[in-house]
């Protein structure tokens, strides 16, 4: 059993990945819905990733940070994320600065969260909203 605390971007991805690997997963979120900060990121437009190569992305971090991030970025890179969103009905586009956003439309950040919610449900993650964890 894997317990993920927090239903933000990192928590949703961690819960989905663990469930995809065959683990029973419960995700605890204090709010009444998942992805509260994702929904407001980028003014509601939701910068989901960067279009650069893994090498380019890692170059933006210190060597120690890069060593920490490298395995994760190679296991699930920006192209995989964009493909996952596309299959969920959210097309993305890279801007000149390399930032990747859902194609402009009202509620694009909420659409990104909806894709993750569907993935979590399909993977069998036990979602428990309104569950504050203390201690």
Where do the language-model regions lie?
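N-terminal Rossmann-like FAD-binding beta1-loop-alpha1 element of flavoenzymes
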Residues: 1-27
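A generic secondary-structure micro-motif detector
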Residues: 4, 70-71, 105-106
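Short N-terminal binding/cap micro-motifs at the start of the first secondary-structure element
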Residues: 11-13, 34-37
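Short, conserved beta-strand segments within well-ordered enzyme catalytic domains
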Residues: 27, 39, 47-49, 126-128
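Glycine-rich active-site loop/strand segments that organize a redox cofactor
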Residues: 45-96
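Feature captures the FAD/FMN-dependent oxidoreductase FAD-binding
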Residues: 75-135
């Amino acid at each position: 059993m894997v317990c993920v605390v927090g239903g933000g971007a990192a928590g949703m991805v961690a819960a989905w990945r663990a469930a995809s690997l065959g683990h029973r997963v419960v995700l605890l979120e204090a709010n009444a819905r998942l992805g509260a900060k994702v929904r407001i990121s980028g003014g509601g437009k939701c910068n989901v990733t960067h279009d650069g190569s893994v090498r380019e992305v890692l170059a933006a971090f210190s060597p120690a940070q890069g060593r920490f991030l490298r395995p994760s970025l190679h296991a699930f890179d920006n192209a995989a994320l964009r493909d996952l969103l596309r299959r969920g009905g959210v097309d993305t586009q890279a801007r000149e600065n390399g930032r990747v956003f859902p194609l402009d439309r009202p509620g694009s950040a909420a659409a990104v969260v909806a894709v993750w919610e569907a993935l979590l449900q399909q993977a069998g993650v036990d979602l428990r909203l309104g569950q504050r964890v203390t201690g």
